[in-house]
Amino acid sequence: MKYYIIAGEASGDLHGSNLMRGLYQEDPAADIRFWGGDMMNEVYKEHQDGVGLVQDYKDGAIIGFIQVALKARSYFEKFKRCFADISSWNPDVVILIDYPGFNFRVAEWAHNKGFKVYYYIAPKVWASREGRIKKLKAFVDKLFIVFPFEIPYFTKKGIDFIYKGNPLIDAIDNSVALKESREEFLRRNSLPDSLVIALMAGSRTGEISSMMPVFMEFADKMHALPEYADYQFIVAAAPSRSMSDYSKYVAGREAYVKVVFGQSYAVLLHAVAAVVNSGTA
Protein backbone atom coordinates (compact mmCIF):
# COMPACT_ATOMS: atom_id res chain seq x y z
CA MET A 1 0.00 0.00 0.00
CA LYS A 2 0.94 3.62 -0.46
CA TYR A 3 0.80 5.70 2.73
CA TYR A 4 0.97 9.50 2.81
CA ILE A 5 1.76 10.68 6.36
CA ILE A 6 1.69 14.26 7.66
CA ALA A 7 3.36 15.26 10.94
CA GLY A 8 3.94 18.92 11.66
CA GLU A 9 6.00 19.07 14.85
CA ALA A 10 8.59 17.22 16.95
CA SER A 11 6.04 15.09 18.80
CA GLY A 12 4.45 14.12 15.50
CA ASP A 13 7.87 13.17 14.15
CA LEU A 14 8.29 10.81 17.11
CA HIS A 15 4.82 9.32 16.72
CA GLY A 16 5.31 9.11 12.97
CA SER A 17 8.61 7.25 13.25
CA ASN A 18 7.03 4.63 15.53
CA LEU A 19 4.04 4.36 13.21
CA MET A 20 6.29 3.86 10.18
CA ARG A 21 8.19 1.08 11.92
CA GLY A 22 4.88 -0.65 12.54
CA LEU A 23 3.71 -0.16 8.97
CA TYR A 24 6.92 -1.59 7.51
CA GLN A 25 6.66 -4.55 9.88
CA GLU A 26 3.04 -5.32 8.99
CA ASP A 27 3.38 -4.38 5.33
CA PRO A 28 6.95 -5.05 4.09
CA ALA A 29 6.02 -3.65 0.68
CA ALA A 30 4.78 -0.37 2.18
CA ASP A 31 5.54 2.71 0.10
CA ILE A 32 5.58 5.82 2.29
CA ARG A 33 5.76 9.51 1.47
CA PHE A 34 5.62 11.98 4.32
CA TRP A 35 5.87 15.39 5.93
CA GLY A 36 7.88 15.06 9.14
CA GLY A 37 11.39 15.21 10.48
CA ASP A 38 14.67 13.44 11.14
CA MET A 39 13.21 10.51 13.08
CA MET A 40 10.70 9.63 10.37
CA ASN A 41 13.35 10.10 7.69
CA GLU A 42 15.72 7.75 9.50
CA VAL A 43 13.09 4.99 9.56
CA TYR A 44 12.29 5.62 5.89
CA LYS A 45 15.94 5.25 4.85
CA GLU A 46 16.16 1.93 6.69
CA HIS A 47 13.42 0.50 4.47
CA GLN A 48 13.23 2.46 1.21
CA ASP A 49 15.50 4.09 -1.33
CA GLY A 50 15.02 7.53 -2.79
CA VAL A 51 13.50 10.57 -1.13
CA GLY A 52 10.31 10.19 0.89
CA LEU A 53 10.43 13.42 2.92
CA VAL A 54 8.36 16.12 1.23
CA GLN A 55 8.49 18.83 3.90
CA ASP A 56 10.56 19.05 7.08
CA TYR A 57 8.43 20.30 9.96
CA LYS A 58 11.34 22.44 11.19
CA ASP A 59 10.78 24.70 8.21
CA GLY A 60 7.50 26.00 9.52
CA ALA A 61 5.77 24.63 12.62
CA ILE A 62 3.67 27.48 14.00
CA ILE A 63 1.11 27.96 16.76
CA GLY A 64 -1.84 30.21 17.36
CA PHE A 65 -3.93 32.59 15.28
CA ILE A 66 -1.38 35.42 15.30
CA GLN A 67 1.42 33.22 13.97
CA VAL A 68 -0.88 31.85 11.27
CA ALA A 69 -1.92 35.38 10.27
CA LEU A 70 1.69 36.56 10.09
CA LYS A 71 2.66 33.61 7.92
CA ALA A 72 -0.59 33.31 5.98
CA ARG A 73 1.07 33.39 2.57
CA SER A 74 3.57 30.61 3.35
CA TYR A 75 0.82 28.60 5.04
CA PHE A 76 -1.34 28.89 1.93
CA GLU A 77 1.58 27.83 -0.25
CA LYS A 78 2.09 24.75 1.93
CA PHE A 79 -1.53 23.75 1.49
CA LYS A 80 -1.18 24.10 -2.28
CA ARG A 81 2.01 22.06 -2.29
CA CYS A 82 0.50 19.41 -0.04
CA PHE A 83 -2.67 19.03 -2.09
CA ALA A 84 -0.74 18.87 -5.36
CA ASP A 85 1.69 16.30 -3.99
CA ILE A 86 -1.05 14.05 -2.64
CA SER A 87 -2.94 14.26 -5.93
CA SER A 88 0.18 13.42 -7.93
CA TRP A 89 1.30 10.54 -5.71
CA ASN A 90 -2.23 9.13 -5.32
CA PRO A 91 -1.84 7.21 -2.03
CA ASP A 92 -4.14 4.49 -0.76
CA VAL A 93 -4.56 6.37 2.50
CA VAL A 94 -3.65 9.75 3.99
CA ILE A 95 -2.58 9.50 7.65
CA LEU A 96 -2.66 12.70 9.70
CA ILE A 97 -0.78 12.94 13.01
CA ASP A 98 -2.23 15.48 15.47
CA TYR A 99 -1.31 19.06 14.26
CA PRO A 100 -4.99 20.02 13.82
CA GLY A 101 -4.44 23.57 12.57
CA PHE A 102 -3.05 22.16 9.34
CA ASN A 103 -4.37 18.62 9.27
CA PHE A 104 -8.08 19.38 9.60
CA ARG A 105 -7.87 21.33 6.36
CA VAL A 106 -6.00 18.46 4.71
CA ALA A 107 -8.59 15.98 6.02
CA GLU A 108 -11.44 17.95 4.46
CA TRP A 109 -9.67 18.31 1.13
CA ALA A 110 -8.52 14.67 0.98
CA HIS A 111 -11.96 13.35 1.90
CA ASN A 112 -13.64 15.48 -0.76
CA LYS A 113 -11.13 14.16 -3.32
CA GLY A 114 -12.02 10.57 -2.46
CA PHE A 115 -8.94 9.60 -0.45
CA LYS A 116 -9.20 7.50 2.70
CA VAL A 117 -8.29 9.61 5.72
CA TYR A 118 -6.93 8.22 9.00
CA TYR A 119 -6.28 10.50 11.98
CA TYR A 120 -3.52 9.10 14.19
CA ILE A 121 -3.39 10.70 17.66
CA ALA A 122 -6.78 12.37 17.92
CA PRO A 123 -6.77 16.16 18.22
CA LYS A 124 -7.58 17.29 21.77
CA VAL A 125 -11.18 18.28 21.04
CA TRP A 126 -12.08 17.34 24.61
CA ALA A 127 -9.87 20.19 25.83
CA SER A 128 -10.75 22.99 23.40
CA ARG A 129 -12.81 23.78 20.29
CA GLU A 130 -15.12 20.82 20.72
CA GLY A 131 -17.01 21.87 17.61
CA ARG A 132 -14.24 20.26 15.56
CA ILE A 133 -15.87 16.91 16.32
CA LYS A 134 -18.19 17.59 13.40
CA LYS A 135 -15.16 17.64 11.10
CA LEU A 136 -13.85 14.38 12.54
CA LYS A 137 -17.20 12.75 11.81
CA ALA A 138 -17.44 14.23 8.33
CA PHE A 139 -13.91 13.84 6.98
CA VAL A 140 -12.09 11.05 8.89
CA ASP A 141 -12.52 7.36 8.08
CA LYS A 142 -10.58 5.99 11.05
CA LEU A 143 -9.64 7.76 14.28
CA PHE A 144 -6.83 6.44 16.49
CA ILE A 145 -6.85 7.54 20.13
CA VAL A 146 -4.13 7.13 22.77
CA PHE A 147 -5.71 8.04 26.11
CA PRO A 148 -8.06 5.70 28.06
CA PHE A 149 -10.33 8.58 29.08
CA GLU A 150 -10.94 9.31 25.39
CA ILE A 151 -12.79 5.99 25.06
CA PRO A 152 -16.00 7.07 26.86
CA TYR A 153 -15.67 10.59 25.44
CA PHE A 154 -15.66 9.58 21.77
CA THR A 155 -18.18 6.80 22.44
CA LYS A 156 -20.60 9.39 23.81
CA LYS A 157 -19.97 11.60 20.79
CA GLY A 158 -20.80 8.73 18.44
CA ILE A 159 -17.38 8.57 16.77
CA ASP A 160 -15.85 5.22 15.87
CA PHE A 161 -12.26 4.89 17.04
CA ILE A 162 -9.39 2.46 17.48
CA TYR A 163 -7.57 2.30 20.80
CA LYS A 164 -4.37 0.26 21.17
CA GLY A 165 -2.70 2.13 24.03
CA ASN A 166 -0.24 5.00 23.92
CA PRO A 167 2.83 4.59 21.65
CA LEU A 168 4.78 6.99 23.85
CA ILE A 169 4.79 4.36 26.59
CA ASP A 170 6.69 2.01 24.29
CA ALA A 171 9.06 4.81 23.31
CA ILE A 172 9.78 5.59 26.96
CA ASP A 173 10.17 1.93 27.91
CA ASN A 174 12.69 1.46 25.09
CA SER A 175 14.57 4.69 25.77
CA VAL A 176 18.28 4.40 26.50
CA ALA A 177 17.72 7.08 29.15
CA LEU A 178 16.31 4.42 31.46
CA LYS A 179 19.52 2.43 31.19
CA GLU A 180 21.88 5.30 31.97
CA SER A 181 22.87 6.35 35.48
CA ARG A 182 22.63 9.92 36.69
CA GLU A 183 26.42 10.11 36.85
CA GLU A 184 26.74 8.96 33.23
CA PHE A 185 24.12 11.48 32.09
CA LEU A 186 25.87 14.37 33.82
CA ARG A 187 29.31 13.34 32.56
CA ARG A 188 28.18 12.84 28.98
CA ASN A 189 26.66 16.32 28.88
CA SER A 190 29.47 18.02 30.86
CA LEU A 191 27.02 19.05 33.57
CA PRO A 192 27.87 19.76 37.22
CA ASP A 193 26.84 17.34 39.95
CA SER A 194 23.95 19.41 41.30
CA LEU A 195 20.20 18.97 41.52
CA VAL A 196 18.28 19.47 38.28
CA ILE A 197 15.08 21.35 37.48
CA ALA A 198 13.90 20.56 33.95
CA LEU A 199 12.50 23.25 31.65
CA MET A 200 10.49 22.10 28.62
CA ALA A 201 9.32 24.95 26.40
CA GLY A 202 8.18 22.93 23.39
CA SER A 203 9.63 22.42 19.94
CA ARG A 204 7.87 25.01 17.79
CA THR A 205 9.42 28.39 17.09
CA GLY A 206 6.37 30.15 18.51
CA GLU A 207 6.48 28.09 21.68
CA ILE A 208 10.16 28.80 22.23
CA SER A 209 9.80 32.55 21.71
CA SER A 210 6.74 32.68 23.97
CA MET A 211 7.87 30.39 26.77
CA MET A 212 11.63 30.84 27.10
CA PRO A 213 11.38 34.39 28.53
CA VAL A 214 8.92 33.07 31.12
CA PHE A 215 11.15 30.12 31.95
CA MET A 216 14.22 32.33 32.28
CA GLU A 217 12.38 34.66 34.64
CA PHE A 218 11.40 31.62 36.68
CA ALA A 219 15.00 30.36 36.72
CA ASP A 220 16.31 33.78 37.77
CA LYS A 221 13.90 34.05 40.68
CA MET A 222 14.54 30.50 41.83
CA HIS A 223 18.31 30.91 41.55
CA ALA A 224 18.12 34.05 43.70
CA LEU A 225 16.67 32.03 46.59
CA PRO A 226 19.38 30.64 48.89
CA GLU A 227 17.83 27.17 49.01
CA TYR A 228 17.93 26.90 45.18
CA ALA A 229 21.17 28.75 44.48
CA ASP A 230 23.05 25.52 43.76
CA TYR A 231 20.41 24.00 41.47
CA GLN A 232 20.91 23.80 37.71
CA PHE A 233 18.07 24.47 35.28
CA ILE A 234 18.26 22.28 32.19
CA VAL A 235 16.34 23.23 29.06
CA ALA A 236 15.32 20.00 27.33
CA ALA A 237 15.43 21.09 23.69
CA ALA A 238 14.03 19.17 20.74
CA PRO A 239 16.64 17.36 18.60
CA SER A 240 15.54 19.44 15.62
CA ARG A 241 16.63 22.68 17.30
CA SER A 242 20.04 24.32 17.60
CA MET A 243 21.72 26.47 20.21
CA SER A 244 20.95 29.56 18.15
CA ASP A 245 17.28 29.10 19.09
CA TYR A 246 18.12 29.45 22.79
CA SER A 247 21.35 31.46 23.08
CA LYS A 248 19.70 34.88 23.43
CA TYR A 249 17.58 33.62 26.31
CA VAL A 250 20.37 31.78 28.12
CA ALA A 251 22.93 34.59 27.69
CA GLY A 252 24.22 35.76 31.07
CA ARG A 253 22.73 32.72 32.81
CA GLU A 254 25.21 30.07 31.67
CA ALA A 255 26.31 29.38 35.26
CA TYR A 256 22.94 27.90 36.20
CA VAL A 257 21.00 27.37 32.93
CA LYS A 258 22.08 24.64 30.52
CA VAL A 259 20.61 23.38 27.24
CA VAL A 260 20.67 19.76 26.08
CA PHE A 261 19.17 18.45 22.85
CA GLY A 262 17.13 15.34 22.13
CA GLN A 263 17.27 14.02 25.70
CA SER A 264 13.89 14.90 27.17
CA TYR A 265 13.39 11.53 28.86
CA ALA A 266 16.84 11.62 30.45
CA VAL A 267 16.40 15.19 31.68
CA LEU A 268 13.05 14.35 33.25
CA LEU A 269 14.40 11.13 34.74
CA HIS A 270 17.21 12.92 36.56
CA ALA A 271 15.29 16.07 37.53
CA VAL A 272 13.79 16.70 40.95
CA ALA A 273 11.12 18.92 39.38
CA ALA A 274 10.02 20.10 35.94
CA VAL A 275 8.27 23.09 34.40
CA VAL A 276 6.55 21.87 31.26
CA ASN A 277 4.76 23.72 28.49
CA SER A 278 1.47 22.08 27.48
CA GLY A 279 1.97 19.42 24.82
CA THR A 280 3.31 15.92 24.32
CA ALA A 281 5.97 16.40 27.00
Question: For the regions a protein language model found, what residue spans apply to each?
Answer:
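Glycosyltransferase donor-sugar binding loop
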Residues: F233-M243
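Active-site and donor-binding regions of nucleotide-sugar-utilizing enzymes
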Residues: Y3-N189, M200-M212, K221, L225
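A donor-sugar binding/catalytic signature common to diverse glycosyltransferases
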Residues: D38-M40, V260-A281
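Charged active-site motifs of nucleotide-sugar-dependent glycosyltransferases
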Residues: K2, L191-A198, Y231-Q232
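Generic structural signal for residues in well-ordered beta-strands
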Residues: I32, F161, F233, V257-V259
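Nucleotide-activated donor-binding/catalytic signature segment of Leloir-type glycosyltransferases, i.e.
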Residues: Y246-Q263
